[in-house]
Design a protein with these regions (language model features):
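Glycan-recognition and catalytic cores of secretory/periplasmic carbohydrate-active enzymes
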Residues: 1-195
Length: 195
């Protein structure tokens, strides 16, 4: 197919159907395709590889964790439940900050960096609540309560009751903003209200 003046290779029909149309044996066609793939990969290896952004983001992982819990509720498939538990254990142990309730925003190459934002905490708390619902293990709800208290202590604006996007002790910002409108994902304030 053609996309933005470039050719994108795609398969339009099953191999066996194409082989019959072209009067070629299926095994012979598979050998031809394997040889073509080798040539294409050789040419591709000559190109500069695109940059790879493989950092782990706390909020995004928490969103995925909630999705796994919901998938378990909908399907009863235990692999979703186990994935949610394993992912939560990873987040709680690898993204932990200077104290038990402070977390980092990203994790890459064995290092957690940057203080977590409001939405990171909000999505993490939400994921903990859903995880407690599917496991009946009270450790998750207890951690959600501790993190909620941490958010209230470190993010709240007393006059309005809204939460700032950054913690009170973050020094590398000029102005602390509040996000109160939802976009592609709900704002941290919306999720905290739901939690």
């Amino acid at each position: 197919g053609n996309w933005e003046h470039s050719n994108i290779l795609r398969v339009k029909k099953p191999i066996d159907e194409f082989a019959v149309e072209k009067n070629i044996g299926v095994d012979e066609l598979k050998k031809i395709l394997i040889n073509c793939n080798k040539k294409l990969l050789q040419e591709r290896s000559k190109r500069i590889r695109p940059l790879l952004d493989d950092k782990i983001i706390l909020g995004w992982n928490a969103l995925m964790n909630t999705a796994c819990s919901k998938a378990y509720c909908a399907t009863g498939r235990d692999e979703y439940r186990q994935l949610a538990i394993n992912n939560m254990n990873f987040m709680l142990s690898n993204l932990k900050g200077k104290d038990d309730n402070a977390y980092h925003h990203t994790f890459k190459e064995g290092k957690a960096k940057f203080p977590a934002f409001l939405d990171d905490y909000a999505f993490l708390i939400e994921a903990l609540i859903f995880l407690q619902e599917i496991t009946a293990d009270k450790q998750w709800i207890e951690k959600a309560k501790l993190l909620t208290n941490h958010v209230i202590q470190n993010f709240i604006e007393e006059e309005t009751g809204f939460f700032f996007y950054t913690p009170v002790d973050q020094q590398d910002i000029i102005v602390r903003k509040k996000e109160v409108y939802d976009s592609a994902v709900p704002s941290g304030n919306s999720v905290m209200a739901y939690n």
